[in-house]
């Protein structure tokens, strides 16, 4: 088995279509329900169907962890402990990713939970990239992380409520900006859409 090297600390965030995401060799699924761990430390992990939930992860010098936090009443009431468990899951954190949530009346706890997690990441981690508040009513995001390559793979979808079919949501920088209410890319991160890098000069408003 190859020994995993420390990450470069310039993480790649790569938005890919669902067809590519579904074929990836993914292990260590992080689920949102209370019957399974919602925070997981591993070299590879992934999570799916983040809608009004908050997802993401933390990368340290020698370890990484991911999370998927449901916006239910129990998590809302226990968010302080949840945040502590997330921030303590990795020693010497270098970068973090926070994604998801919806700013809608049907999910009143979604943005408060997201905001508290985002603020905690900003306090405890030097470099944080944020993809905040999915605009699409039936939008969702999946993610996977591989510490060996230090790459976050993100997949955004619109789901047809009539037949459940998936519609690709991100084809370029404009559609990415239309999918989220706010995007902020950390100085240590690089953004890619379908393998093509988006440089700060291409969209300066989203780069810190």
Model-derived regions, located:
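Phosphate-centric recognition/catalysis
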Residues: 16-48
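Divalent-metal-activated hydrolytic enzyme cores
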Residues: 16-19, 106-208
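Acidic, glycine-rich active-site loops and adjacent beta-strand->loop/helix elements
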Residues: 71-72, 100-104
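Short glycine-rich phosphate-binding loop at a beta-alpha junction
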Residues: 92-100
């Amino acid at each position: 088995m190859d020994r995993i090297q420390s990450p470069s600390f310039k993480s790649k965030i790569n938005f890919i279509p669902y067809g590519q995401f579904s074929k990836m060799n993914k292990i260590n699924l992080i689920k949102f329900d209370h019957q399974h761990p919602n925070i997981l430390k591993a070299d590879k992990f992934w999570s799916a169907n983040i809608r009004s939930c908050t997802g993401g992860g933390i990368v340290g010098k020698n370890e990484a962890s991911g999370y998927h936090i449901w916006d239910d009443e129990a998590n809302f009431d226990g968010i302080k402990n949840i945040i502590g468990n997330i921030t303590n899951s990795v020693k010497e954190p270098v970068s973090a990713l926070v994604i998801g949530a919806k700013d809608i009346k049907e999910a009143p706890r979604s943005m408060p939970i997201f905001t508290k997690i985002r603020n905690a990441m900003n306090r405890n981690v030097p470099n944080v990239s944020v993809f905040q508040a999915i605009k699409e009513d039936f939008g969702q995001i999946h993610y996977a992380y591989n510490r060996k390559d230090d790459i976050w793979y993100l997949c955004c979808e619109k789901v047809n409520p009539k037949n459940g079919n998936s519609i690709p949501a991100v084809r370029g920088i404009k559609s990415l900006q239309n999918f989220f209410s706010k995007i902020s890319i950390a100085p240590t991160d690089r953004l890619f859409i379908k393998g093509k890098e988006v440089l700060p000069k291409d969209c300066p408003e989203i780069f810190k």
